[in-house]
Amino acid sequence: GEVRRAELAGHVDLVEEDDSGAVIITDWKTAGRAYGYDEVNRNPQVTLYQLAAKANGFSDREILLRFDCLLKTQKPRFEQYYTIRTEVEERRLIRKIRTVWEGISSGVFIPNDTSWRCPNCHYRQACDQWFLEGGD
């Protein structure tokens, strides 16, 4: 099918190079608890950072992804989590993004009312209206 390009703008918190020449892309986080496996290894944000790094001159380099987390627990602490992404994981995310974009472009709207962000979301009224109208 037709290949379309889209620009994505964002800010990476920190990019470093280690002694071996690997690129380390770090995302700073604040959380109320330690991160679990899924939060580290399935996070789409750092997958996008890796894709951006590869598209901007780092495709021939080893890329490590890191979360630097300040945990706001009863006794605050700092934890680091390292992860990597495979080509399959990159392509999986690209496919998901394309599929969602195609849906949005076609007028498909499916609210995610299970998110913790829902109560303060700017689109809350649109979601509520969608449910009131029967989801059509």
Whereabouts are the PLM-identified features?
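Non-catalytic protein-protein interaction segments used by genome-maintenance enzymes to assemble
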Residues: 1-46, 51-54
